[in-house]
Every structure is written in C-alpha cells, then in structure tokens.
Design a protein with these regions (language model features):
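Short acidic alpha-helical/loop segments enriched in Asp/Glu that coordinate divalent cations
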Residues: 41-43, 68-70, 93-94
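Peripheral (often C-terminal) accessory segments that flank ATP-dependent C-N-forming ligase machineries
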Residues: 82-167
Length: 167
C-alpha cells in the first residue's frame, strides 16, 4: 500500500514481502548483463488484466522502505560491511522470508488493505515478523516519541481524505 497525499504519493506505507523467485532471477540476470553493482530496488506492479508483473522503474539506491529486506532477515548494512570493508565474496541470496513492513498505524493498514491480506498480516505480527523502521525501542526520547505519534495519528486523516477504502 502506498501513500496517496499530493506530497507523499508513491511512498510506501505497507509492504508485505513474499518470495518471487522467477522475477528475482530475471532482474538478477538483467543487472549482471548491464554490469550493475550496488543496491537497487525495482518498482513492480501486478497487472490483473494479463496476469503478468510489470517492471517500470529501477531505483539505484536504498531508501526508507528498503528496511523491509532487514525485516525479511537480511541486514543490508551488515552485507555492505562484509562486501566493501571485509572484502568477502558474498553469494547471491534470494530474500524469501515473509515479513510485514509498515509506517502507518495498524488500524490504517487494516482499513485500507483488501481483506484478502488481513490474516497474513495478523500472522506476521503475531510471529514477530513485522518491522516498523521509524520506531526503535532504544531510540525513544520524549520529543521524538511525541513527533512520531503525531505523525502516526496524521495518517488517519490523510488516508481518509486521499485514499479510497478497499474491501
């Protein structure tokens, strides 16, 4: 699910990771063919009209939402240090562990994501397979905590105004 405010459109609000080996293999082959080395992510959409995934953008960087990779069990910072600092030869690994990444309140996620995904989301939360990159239990000074809570509450109004509810 993405944000839909005029300023935030295109930013991720919720990500459910799932294995997708066929697409990952095609993208890996493409990156190797062009000699690309480094972090990247691709914007991919599933087209229900023809049952195919459509790749429409590569982002040659890691951004806020890339923390979902850590949520799936692969710490990007650790891999970067092992590769560039320690000089380790790291094999290709497909991050195929399911996880839930979100920056919106739980109620907003459940209200605006189609109900087909609700049980999976609940299961991942119960299993501790949820990551919330804006909240870290050791980084809770009062002013920051208040700002983060205000930010969270603001999503209720933003989604109500700009996003059509899914059922």
């Amino acid at each position: 699910m993405e944000e839909h405010t005029p300023h935030g459109i295109g930013n991720h609000a919720v990500i459910l990771t799932e294995p997708c080996g066929e697409i990952a293999e095609k993208i890996r082959a493409f990156l190797e063919d062009i000699g690309y080395v480094g972090f990247s992510n691709f914007d991919i959409k599933y087209d229900q009209r023809d049952g195919k995934y459509k790749v429409f953008e590569i982002n040659c960087r890691q951004g806020r939402s890339n923390y979902y990779v850590t949520g799936a069990g692969y710490n990007i910072a650790k891999l970067l240090v092992e590769d560039r600092v320690e000089g380790k030869d790291l094999p290709f690994v497909l991050a195929d562990n399911p996880s839930l990444w979100r920056v919106v309140p739980r109620k907003v996620a459940f209200r605006y994501i189609v109900s087909d995904y609700h049980q999976e989301m609940k299961d991942l939360m119960r299993q501790g397979r949820e990551v919330r990159p804006l909240f870290y239990h050791k980084d809770r000074p009062l002013l920051r905590t208040l700002r983060m809570e205000k930010n969270l509450l603001g999503h209720f109004q933003k989604f109500k105004r700009y996003y059509q509810r899914k059922s």
